[in-house]
Amino acid sequence: MTAAARARLAIRGVSYSYPGGRPVLDDVDMDVTPGALTLVCGASGSGKSTVLRLLNGLIPNFHEGELSGRVLIDDEDVSSAPIERSGLRTATVFQNPASQFFTTTVADELAFAPQNYRVEAGEIRRRRAGALEELGIGDLADRDLRTLSGGQVQKVACAQALAQRTPVILLDEPTSNLDPRAIDDVRATIGRLKAAGRTLVVAEHRIYFLRGLVDEVVIMGRGRVVHRMAGEVLWRIGEARRKELGLRALERPRLAVRPAGLAAIAGGPGGRPGADDAAEDAVGNGAVDVDDADDAAGDGADGLLIENLQVERSGRLVLDIPRLFFPAGAVTGVVGANGVGKTTLARAVCRLQRARRGARMSLGGRELRSGRAFLVMQDVHRQLFTESVSQEASAPQLERLDLAALADRHPLSLSGGQKQRLVIATAIDQDARVLILDEPTSGVDHRHLVAIAAELRDLAREGRVVIVISHDVEFLNECADRVIDMV
């Protein structure tokens, strides 16, 4: 990786409000040291993503609203510079990475931005090959983007940013849907980018993986910078202070519940080497034999029983589960490497994914009917339909999930974590007996992580089947009674 020109970033007295909304940023001042890694953290809705949109020029060139103050890159005001210049200086990995794709295949996507800047064809091929190798996704090059798992999409977005070769890279929750092995890959990539002189700004709730890489920390609250500290200071603040600041774990969490192994895919997860190792990392204790899952197999009398579930894609078997039981009255976590089939399982249960003939799913001994299962998707944008938060969910659920103050806001104007909680509120309103949540803590801060976990435990106590698909061990430790490891 070659050295990159260093860029100076500064925010001077910036206040900003999205159209029709309250101020999101209030008199923010921030300096980003060239060649350093600056971590921006804080509660959901505190303005972290908005800061990144200022730095890459999306505000005010794409997002309208009321803006005052100055955003400078190399002493040039971003708001007055041509938008195409921003693309030469900054690359961004967005919180919802699928929203930044413009083509249909991974290879085409990595070439798209350089092509727009008339980079020579041979150089584009070299950049693409290097980015694919850097993220360990060479096997995905010819894949249709629509067929990728959430974690794979995240890695493609990171590769896309690398291929642009900009001096500044902005990352908004870059590990939100990644398994532990992939998080380690992202950490290694960030380390190499930093060593090459790139200026990095990372907005994250999950911060343990950045230990030893962070130079500067900016903690935001209610649209203002409330704390600044050196990177090494953050990891010395102690547990009490960490919780007071609303930050998530500073050390890599280990799963408290011993998982039961489930061989869910014929021939393993796509035949990918190392998938079992990734699953072992996800649980901390190691994947166990499939037979260990039998003690929780159940007879389906009080829970969800799945039998002979097979799903194929493009003629290839991608999911094969002979028998699996999820008890009512408990929260079951589902872990496993990216691409192993966790989301496919969830979609099949909710009749969003066609299964082979012969599959049987029963709830309480009776056939599982449509509408009895509800899925909170990874991409929650697909589940928000109305003009206001109050139209999406009932007042009691908004109150329970700390959204009542946002009742008049448009759902798509919310932060990533707020959108996540809103869709969970709508799921509770549906009174589904099987509730499946796919990576429900993407963009969620520590306080709301604990609140969501408590809500899920309450829902389970009401007799529901609650299934949580997650790589977030910190969250699973808060809510899961049992864990299944798909390998």
Range-by-range predicted roles:
Residues 77-91, 195, 362-376:
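ABC ATPase NBD coupling module
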Residues 122-140, 394-406:
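Conserved ABC ATPase "signature" region
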Residues 144-148, 152, 410-414, 418:
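Conserved ABC ATPase signature
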Residues 158, 424:
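Hydrophobic anchor residue at the start of the ABC signature
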Residues 161-162, 427-428:
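ABC ATPase C-loop
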Residues 169-172, 435-438:
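Catalytic Walker B motif of ABC-type/P-loop ATPase nucleotide-binding domains
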Residues 204-205, 470-471:
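H-loop/switch region of ABC-family ATPase nucleotide-binding domains
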